[in-house]
From Swiss-Prot:
InterPro entries: THDP-binding, Transketo_C/PFOR_II, Transketolase-like_Pyr-bd, Transketolase_C. Its EC number is 1.2.4.1. This is Pyruvate dehydrogenase E1 component subunit beta-3, chloroplastic. The keyword NAD does not apply. Tetramer of 2 alpha and 2 beta subunits. Thiamine diphosphate binds at residue 127.
Length: 391
C-alpha cells in the first residue's frame, strides 16, 4: 500500500516538475564546498599522523570575516530543506503538521507555501504509516524527509525503520536504494517527561543499513541535513530540542558537511573527550574549569553516531592516551558503550588509563526540573572524571 501511494506521489511530482529540471548528478553550475580540514599532530613515539576532522567552528569563523548571515539552528535546517527542494524536485517532506503549521519547532515553516501541499505533505497521527510511505517513496525514486513530531513517537514506526528502511537494500539484493532522511526533535531539558525526552540513538544503532548523525550547531545542522538528503543511504538526523535557538553566522555560499567525519572542537594534549549534541556544551563549559586547573582537554564532537569516525578519534587517542566519553544517551546499550567497544578493539595499545563514560541514568526522565537535571551529565561530573582519569 505504501509503495502504491508512493508511486502515485512520484507520478504527480514528476509531472509537476519543470521539463528543464536537471538530475542531481548534472549540476555544473553549482559551487558546493565540502568542508573537511586536515592537519597534523604528534602521536606516540613522535610519529606525525594526519587528523581528519570537520572543523565547523574554524570555518564558520573564517567565513564570518568575509560575509555570511546569522541564523538559529532550526532556521539553518530550514535553509537546507529549501535549497535542496529548489534544486531537486524529488525531495519531499512528510510528517504531522509539517505543512501550513510549519512543524512542531517551525523547521518546515513556509515550505508548504513555497512548494505546495503535495511536496510538503501533512499526515495523520500514524507514524508507522507515514514512515512506510516514506520508504515506499524512496523505493520509487523520491528523496523523502520524514519528520517525527518528537523522536519518541518514532518508536511507533520502528518496524518500518528497521525491517524496511534499514534492510531493504540488502534484502532486495541491491535492487532498491532507500535515500530517505528521518529527523526530528528529542533529548532532555524541557521538562517534557519520559515519553517526550527519548534518546533513540540506542534503539536505532543496532539496525543494519542506517546511518546516524547528530547536529550541534547551526553550521553543521545545515551541512549535515544537505548531505543526508543527497545520500543514497537512509540517514537518521538527531536534533536536540534545547539547541534549536542557538545562533551562529554561517556562509552565504553553499556548503555540505561529510556525514562520516567528526569535528575537532578544541585541540588538547592531556585527555580526549568524545561527545555529541547538547553534551558538547556541557563539555566545553567543563573545559574552561579544567584549563584553569591546569588540564588541556581535547574535545571532539563525534557527530557521526554510526559509523564512528575512528580515524579522527584514533589519532586523538594516539596523542592523549586517555579517553572520556560524555553522552546524554542511556548508559545501558547507549552510543557510549558502542564507542568504548570500538576504541578497545582498535586502540587498546595506546591507552594509558581505563576509558571512562559518563551517561544519563537508566531511569525514565522525570518531569521535575531538579530531578531531570540529576539524570543527565553535568559539567562538574565531567571535571571530576577528567581529574580522575589524568591522575
Amino acid at each position: 500500500m505504501a509503495t502504491a501511494a508512493a508511486a502515485s506521489l512520484q507520478y504527480a511530482l514528476h509531472g509537476a516538475a519543470s521539463a528543464s529540471a536537471k538530475p542531481r548528478s548534472a549540476a555544473p553550475g553549482r559551487s558546493v564546498r565540502v568542508v573537511a580540514a586536515r592537519r597534523s599532530v604528534r602521536a606516540r613515539g613522535g610519529a606525525v599522523v594526519a587528523r581528519a576532522a570537520v572543523t565547523a567552528s574554524a570555518d564558520a569563523t573564517a567565513e564570518s570575516k568575509s560575509g555570511g548571515h546569522e541564523v538559529l539552528l532550526f532556521e539553518a535546517l530550514r535553509e537546507a530543506l529549501i535549497e535542496e527542494m529548489k534544486e531537486d524536485p524529488t525531495v519531499c517532506v512528510f510528517g504531522e503538521d509539517v505543512g501550513h503549521y510549519g512543524g512542531s519547532y517551525k523547521v518546515t515553516k513556509g515550505l508548504a507555501e513555497m512548494f505546495g501541499d503535495l511536496r510538503v505533505l501533512d499526515t495523520p497521527i500514524a507514524e508507522n504509516s507515514f514512515a512506510g510511505m516514506g520508504v515506499g517513496a524512496a523505493m520509487k525514486g523520491l528523496r523523502p524527509i520524514v519528520e517525527g513530531m518528537n523522536m519518541g513517537f518514532l518508536l511507533l514506526a520502528y518496524n518500518q525503520i528497521s525491517n524496511n528502511c534499514g534492510m531493504l537494500h540488502y534484502t532486495s539484493g541491491g535492487q532498491f536504494k532507500i535515500p530517505i532522511v528521518i529527523r526530528g526533535p528529542g533529548g532532555v531539558g524541557r521538562q517534557l517527561g519520559a515519553e517526550h525526552s527519548q534518546r533513540l540513538e540506542s534503539y536505532f544503532q543496532s539496525i543494519p543499513g542506517l546511518q546516524m548523525v547528530a547536529c550541534s550547531t547551526p553550521y553543521n545542522a545545515k551541512g549535515l541535513m544537505k548531505a543526508a538528503i543527497r545520500s543514497e543511504n537512509p540517514v537518521v538526523l538527531f536534533e536536540h530540542v534545547l539547541l534549536y535557538n542557538l545562533k551562529e553566522k554561517i556562509p552565504d555560499e553553499e556548503y555540505i558537511c561529510c556525514l562520516e567525519e567528526a569535528e575537532m572542537v578544541r585541540p588538547g594534549e592531556h585527555v580526549t573527550i568524545l561527545t555529541y549534541s547538547r553534551m558538547r556544551y556541557h563539555v566545553m563549559q567543563a573545559a574552561k574549569t579544567l584549563v584553569n586547573k591546569g588540564y588541556d582537554p581535547e574535545v571532539i564532537d563525534i557527530r557521526s553516531l554510526k559509523p564512528f569516525d575512528l580515524h579522527t578519534i584514533g589519532n586523538s587517542i594516539k596523542k592523549t592516551h586517555r579517553v572520556l566519553i560524555v553522552e546524554e544517551c542511556m548508559r545501558t546499550g547507549g552510543i557510549g558503550a558502542s564507542l568504548r567497544s570500538a576504541i578497545i578493539d582498535n586502540f587498546w595499545d595506546y591507552l594509558d588509563a581505563p576509558i571512562m563514560c559518563l551517561s544519563s541514568q537508566d531511569v525514565p526522565t522525570p518531569y521535575a526540573a531538579t530531578l531531570e537535571d540529576a539524570t543527565v551529565v553535568q559539567p562538574a561530573q565531567i571535571v571530576a572524571a577528567v581529574e580522575q582519569i589524568c591522575q
